[in-house]
């Protein structure tokens, strides 16, 4: 996992200066294109931070590693046939290509969570820091999980194309858990709304003091309550954000 993570990270780091801005509209359309064809009974869209940028697609696969003069070399691959047939030509973020590698090492090599962690840390060490910031990897802002969903949709399409029933069943089992993750994200959005409730409370306290409808003490108390609600909601929101790995 160390070599695979580092190799992908080094390749992507070279491509980073060629990156294009956040293209979340087309990335979400890409998900819709797959959903429309596959009919998976799931629907997921996500925002993405400005740090999430598209890069030229270069993938590596654990089954396509060569040894040249005693050193390992990765054979670069294109996107899958299913993606070429069903999706657009937009660039994907570096995290999307990492998740694609994660999916293949789990499928082909049986990697366990601790090995995935090593893979991720070695990749993270080589790519721009902004790509792996807390917000860039936040599940409520897309992060790694939306690209796992994308990868499983692609796996579903590939399994249908090649008649791979075992792989199809595995992808369907994964997709059944999507609704539970989305329900959790829905709860987080409720907590996030508490931030605006708190801000509104502070604004009301200010104008109530200005209009003298509340005493200074009561206005200050209301403003403090609003700030507690706002700060507390924001802390809970980020604390409960599902970890990327």
Model-derived regions, located:
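ATP/Mg2+ or Mg2+-diphosphate-binding catalytic cores
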Residues: 111-131, 135, 145-226, 230-233, ...
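Detector for the conserved DFG-like motif's central hydrophobic residue
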Residues: 76-77
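ATP-dependent phospho-/nucleotidyl transfer catalytic cores
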Residues: 1-71, 80-100, 104, 122, ...
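C-terminal end-of-chain micro-motif
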Residues: 85, 244-245
């Amino acid at each position: 996992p160390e070599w695979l993570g580092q190799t992908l990270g080094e390749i992507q780091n070279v491509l980073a200066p060629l990156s294009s801005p956040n293209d979340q509209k087309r990335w979400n359309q890409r998900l819709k294109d797959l959903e429309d064809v596959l009919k998976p009974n799931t629907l997921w869209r996500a925002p993405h931070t400005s740090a999430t940028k598209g890069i030229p697609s270069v993938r590596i696969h654990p089954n396509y590693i060569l040894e040249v003069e005693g050193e390992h070399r990765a054979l670069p691959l294109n996107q899958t046939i299913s993606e070429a047939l069903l999706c657009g030509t937009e660039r994907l973020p570096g995290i999307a290509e990492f998740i694609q590698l994660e999916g293949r090492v789990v499928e082909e090599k049986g990697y366990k969570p601790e090995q995935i962690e090593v893979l991720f840390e070695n990749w993270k060490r080589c790519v721009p820091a902004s790509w792996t910031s807390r917000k860039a990897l936040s599940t409520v802002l897309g992060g790694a999980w939306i690209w796992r969903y994308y990868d499983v949709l692609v796996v579903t399409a590939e399994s249908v194309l090649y008649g791979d029933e075992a792989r199809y069943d595995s992808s369907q089992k994964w997709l059944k858990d999507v609704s539970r993750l989305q329900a959790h994200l829905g709860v987080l959005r409720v907590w996030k709304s508490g931030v605006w409730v708190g801000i509104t409370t502070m604004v009301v306290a200010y104008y109530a003091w200005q209009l003298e409808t509340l005493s200074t003490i009561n206005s200050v108390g209301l403003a403090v309550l609003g700030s507690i609600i706002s700060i507390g909601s924001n802390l809970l929101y980020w604390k409960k954000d599902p970890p990327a790995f």
